[in-house]
Regions:
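Phosphate-end processing signature that detects enzymes handling 5′-triphosphorylated RNA
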Residues: 1-207
Length: 207
């Protein structure tokens, strides 16, 4: 399985600081523009206390059936490792209902991995968090502004319901800024660690 490997820093800032920081970034990055989108992430319950244990998520970008992803994420030696694969709406429903036998022999390594972990550790759908984000790919990494973070009421059954009730998790006068910087390794090291094919960074960090 191939992973995007990156360092991550995050901090809450005020609305005024957000406006100034965004303007400075746009001036520095030239013609690059921020992408605005909504992301809902459903976390599968497991050992939440240990960041070194991999966590799994179903992610829906802009409530689009064409942008549903299964995500695996864990931290090792202060470096985040992340893998993701596209999922159809039908397959997403099967995963949520625990109908995952089809993943056992899938060509997609992440599906096989999820099947194994879900079977061994009895993973089950947990809470859904919604993020309203702005993201920009910079010359040296990715900047994300989380303008709103809400916990969706009703659990996984409301993953695709746009009018679902929610509880605010971020103060209204605050913005959570996240910076991700890719770990740069020589191609030969990448190939030894992840196989002969280099990871498509754009795909791995699509949200």
């Amino acid at each position: 399985m191939q992973y995007a490997m990156y360092y991550e820093e995050q901090q809450q800032i005020s609305q005024d600081e957000y406006g100034k920081m965004k303007q400075q970034i746009l001036l520095r990055e030239g013609e690059r523009k921020f992408e605005s989108y909504t992301l809902r992430k459903l976390k599968f319950t497991g050992n939440d206390a240990d960041e070194t244990v991999a966590h799994y998520y179903l992610c829906v970008k802009d409530q689009s059936e064409q942008q549903i992803y299964l995500e695996k994420k864990y931290m090792q030696n202060h470096i985040w490792h992340r893998a993701c694969a596209k999922v159809t709406k039908k397959s997403c429903g099967q995963i949520l209902r625990g109908e995952i036998d089809w993943m056992k022999n899938s060509k997609e390594a992440l599906f096989r991995d999820f099947y194994l972990q879900a079977t061994l550790n009895h993973l089950s759908p947990g809470r859904v968090i919604e993020y309203q984000r702005e993201m920009l790919k910079c010359k040296d990494g990715y900047v994300m502004f989380n303008k709103k973070i809400n916990c969706i009421v009703g659990g996984w059954g409301n993953l695709f319901w746009p009018e679902a009730m929610s509880i605010h998790c971020l103060d209204e006068d605050k913005v959570l800024v996240v910076y991700k910087k890719k770990v740069n390794l020589p191609n030969t090291i990448w190939e030894m660690m992840q196989g002969n094919t280099l990871l498509n960074e754009e795909k791995a960090l699509v949200f």
